[in-house]
Amino acid sequence: MDYSKTLNLPQTQFPMRGNLPQREPETQKYWQEIDLYKKVQEKNKGKTKFILHDGPPYANGHIHLGHTLNKVLKDIIVKYRSMSGYDAPYVPGWDTHGLPIEQQAIKQLGINRHQVNPVEFRAKCKDYALKWANTQSEEFQRLGVRGDWENPYYTLLPQYEATQIRVFGEMAKKGYIYKGLKPVYWCASCETALAEAEVEYADKTSPSIYVKFPVKDGKGVLPQDAAVVIWTTTPWTLPANVAISVHPEFEYVLAAVQNQKIVVAKELLESFKQAVGAEEAEILATYQGEQLERVVCQHPFIDERESLVILGEHVTLDAGTGAVHTAPGHGEEDFMVGKKYELPVLAPIDNRGRFTSEGGKFQGQFIMDANKTIIEELKERDALMGHVSIKHQYPHCWRCKQPIFFRATEQWFASVDGFRQEALQAIRNVKWVPSWGEDRIYNMVEGRGDWCVSRQRTWGVPIPIFYCNDCGKEIITEETISHIEKLFREHGSDIWFAKEANELVPASLTCPHCGKGKDFRKETDTMDVWFDSGSSHLAVLNQPELWPEQQRPADLYLEGSDQHRGWFNSSLSTSVAVTGKPPYKTVLTHGFTVDEKGRKMSKSLGNVVDPLKICSQMGADILRLWVSSADYRADLALSQNILKQMTESYRKIRNTARFLLGNLYDFDPVKDKVAYDKLPELDRVALMELHKLIKQVLAAYENYEFHIVYHAVHNYCVVDLSAFYLDIIKDRLYTAVPGSLERRAAQTVLYEALDALVRLLTPVLAFTTEEIYKYMPVVGDRLASVQMLDMPEVNVEYMDVELEKKWDKIHEIRKEVLKALEVARKNKVIGNALEAKVDLYVAGDVEEVLKPMAAELTTLFIVSKVNLHGLAAAPADAVKAEELELALQVATAEGGKCERCWMYHEEVGNDAEHATLCPRCATVVKEHHTA
């Protein structure tokens, strides 16, 4: 007889190999066909809402690993919430205006934006933005992200733009919007002003020079033959110099250096001496900074210009001379201190970073090139005391990566002072995860200057302001804002560029300033894109005709930690300014993606990992598993090596699921499930371990600690199940009577474990759990998707503290037995564990635990025989456990090997009909497998 046919061996069609690159797109297609998003929304209608508001990625280029991390984290949260009793809609969005799109449109069309019709140009920009938004949408869906992909938000939608105009108008109404001459970050390459959030720092080599400003009028304090020395790394700003700032409380010295009388801060004299290569410096006099106020110096190369010595708290002793070259047109602090002294604001630089006619002999030169010319000029006039090159951190444009500079221009600003205190209070009312985010954004808002909201670009939402051609004053009223809002809602912002000002204003408009003006012109600047995305809390969350399921404030904003100064900040500013409240309840930030050495990913380093390539080679679930595997609050590393580890972890989880499925082929949970009180103790312990896992994982999801979800589930599959419970019950599953209580009890646990694992893993391994769900037995009707199930609940009945204590002890004992078996295997006493007989010598609590379950010990240790003895009877060569009252001996089991269960038994051969079986197997075969 072929006894293998009498075994209940695993049967399942669930494939061992994931083959994810082929299977996942099929699953994705299925989700689209059944309109899964809609189905989930219908199922959860009327439940408590959970709104995760999507920070819009920029509609430019394919998605990268950072996008993957961000979108998968959001998807994990939304899926968890929708399986936990919440109505959790997810509306993806895109940031669709701004410079990079303009640049790409210019590049692809080969045009000059100054020579093209703005309406045509904007149409090209729109096409480009929507093309990439659609591409990214497909790529995000390939990652398994569930959302309202048919109805996303774009910042270029007419309704969105109209709401943005309303936000701007409300801020203007409250007096927060003003026009002013002020130094702003300026990018010559992009020809536009930049907000602080658009600035990044990178190394740059600059000239470091020490320059003499001869004293013209010492005010009875400084001698006429002295010179105040300044230090600068931007020689090109010297043509705009009008003052020298000193700190009122620092000590300054008049010193003889290289046969010249110079003035520098006392504390910096030594470093100055070294910098200019002087051997000696003799101090001739000492002054308090405030004594030098209003001393007049001569500009080093503009003969008709004086430079006034003024006092400034911004002066430091970190480097230089303690006397700071001050050009109010090229620096924020310079501008502030210059205002106090009513100094002129000079900025003789045009949009492209070239000197204008006001720059005199430097006219037409690009500022960075002019450094050289200016240094030559200083040398000729004997005004240069020292010159070296230094490498330092310098602001660059985050778009084009070119160095930028401060330039005073007329710009539109949002006055942060108007709502700063409210914003700071709002920050305290929001939950920040990780908690350090709170202080980070608080300090940023507390210290930030006014927000420059205007940009000199075409592709954006226009600043809705008119100018009266009679009196020249700007006009922004409730009437004009309401009118423009209505026009934009109907036609989009293109209408601003298509029509003249007089066609855009309300027909009845008369200039409110002069009372007679009827002829108008319109503002040509557009809004900062941070104002676009920063208005989404009203433009999306409060736009019921487009997204009725959304509501304000959002429960959660989740982006990279760079958004403390970006989207979190701009959203907070517009929300507090307009509504007095924050736009979000909780803000969660993640780190950035790096390689395994912690380096930023870059093409030049060759360490860029393409998520789409991973999807086509390994599968999106491998990437999703990676996102869940590390603490995303720090930077996340990814490399081929890490991907290999993820694939291995995935394989273990998949194999566990396959084993569970394979042993449930004949199990109907409705008919065959065994009641808890009828389960053997081992099975009750297994259920307790499962429900401890459920409790831990649900708490981790609630706390956004997905790495705990991953490690707990992985550990459960590999250790609690595979290396313990599943190993022990294999004999029962395969050899017992198919419908027996002992087998059905084990299957009950397997079913509960599979059912819980599928639910717990769905937010992470969305594709794989969908596949498992197709094959597993279910109670009632099978739902259209695994994502429509609810999270498992913890059953407190399964939590038995006494049982847990007892089995903790059994685990310790088992560990000692397995160790001894391993030694016996190495010493060739046995081949595998079933060839072993184990003698245990026990006392105390070990005896207490093992004695009542003596009959189950062969199963528990997966050996053929276990004998229990008192510890006192232990022979000298028995192995003693270090921390337990236990000694053990392993020997070869007596008797023959049963052909069916492979255990050794002294009675194998006693049954003539089944001579190769042990009594247990012979009975099962006779009663259930004999024709």
UniProtKB/Swiss-Prot annotation:
Its EC number is 6.1.1.5. It catalyses: tRNA(Ile) + L-isoleucine + ATP = L-isoleucyl-tRNA(Ile) + AMP + diphosphate. A motif ('HIGH' region) lies at residues 57-67. One of its GO terms (biological process) is isoleucyl-tRNA aminoacylation. GO terms for cellular component: cytosol. L-isoleucyl-5'-AMP binds at E559. Belongs to the class-I aminoacyl-tRNA synthetase family. IleS type 1 subfamily. Monomer. This is Isoleucine--tRNA ligase. The gene is ileS.
